[in-house]
Amino acid sequence: MADLDDIKDGKDFGIGIPQQNPAFTLKGSGSLDWGMQSRLARIFNPKTNRTVMLAFDHGYFQGPTTGLERIDINIAPLFEYADVLMCTRGILRSVVPAAANRPVVLRASGANSILTYLSNEAVAVAMEDAVRLNACAVAAQVYIGTEHEHQSIKNIIQLIDQGMRYGMPTMAVTGVGKDMVRDQRYFSLASRIAAEMGAQVIKTYYVDSGFERIAAGCPVPIVIAGGKKLPERDALEMCYQAIDQGASGVDMGRNIFQSDAPIAMLKAVHAIVHKNENAAAAYQLFLHEQN
């Protein structure tokens, strides 16, 4: 400990210069606690307020589907090219190296399979475990217009409440009821309900008509799901249109890991999301990287 006689008076106090408090500019997040903003700043690049997530949580209801048979062989080489990893805690602990040093969005809903009703989910992760795993957000499905709509909304409310206690963001993932049309009206409804409940991020689907309304009507960031595997040019066009119409990023799985050149695909998506490249330029980048 320094002696009292050795303490020197400070001189440069910047008197007359107001203290700098840079605003947290991510959509709808300016009033959140410091810890939650810090986690969101790891998910969304503060320079662009956008993100490229790599989703490989499909096994929680699909099992070892194509491309996810061996996470350590097929997916691990992609980690460094994604901004964020989205997975289950089982895969995180068993396969993902801590040294990968990538933010994680942790799948926190489950208890179903493709053999039953997909909408009948429960909260599958305690918030304390998400904190223990150093996750940057938890994610759960919300199924508007299904038999289990009420339970799915209760699930995200539970995660949101617990997340507020621990500074952990919640990403609500909009599912689709069997009798619901995948259109702007449905996804606007589902996204807005989840945001109104307090979700800090919404993951939803891109639609060809009216997506800009979905994005504009949602008060928090929207990231789009990649959905089923598309030809690379089509997937990049979808990505470009979503970003151009107000999405804050993408959370792609099958359109990455089922591609013949997944690293090239990730680089092309990154160029659209963070460098504002159009789909044609991104596809040329994909072809170049593929070769």
Swiss-Prot record:
Pfam families: DeoC. It is found in: Cytoplasm. GO terms for cellular component: cytoplasm. Keywords: Cytoplasm, Schiff base, Transferase. Disulfide bonds: none annotated. Belongs to the DeoC/FbaB aldolase family. It comes from the Bacteria. The lineage of its organism: Bacteria, Pseudomonadati, Pseudomonadota, Gammaproteobacteria, Enterobacterales. It catalyses: dihydroxyacetone phosphate + acetyl-CoA = 3-hydroxy-2,4-dioxopentyl phosphate + CoA. InterPro entries: Aldolase_TIM, DeoC/FbaB/LacD_aldolase, DeoC/FbaB_aldolase, FbaB-like, LsrF. Involved in the degradation of phospho-AI-2, thereby terminating induction of the lsr operon and closing the AI-2 signaling cycle. Catalyzes the transfer of an acetyl moiety from 3-hydroxy-5-phosphonooxypentane-2,4-dione to CoA to form glycerone phosphate and acetyl-CoA. Homodecamer. The keyword Transferase applies. Signal peptide: none annotated. GO terms for molecular function: acyltransferase activity, transferring groups other than amino-acyl groups; fructose-bisphosphate aldolase activity. Its EC number is 2.3.1.245. Transmembrane segments: none annotated. This is 3-hydroxy-5-phosphonooxypentane-2,4-dione thiolase. The active site is at 203 (schiff-base intermediate with substrate).
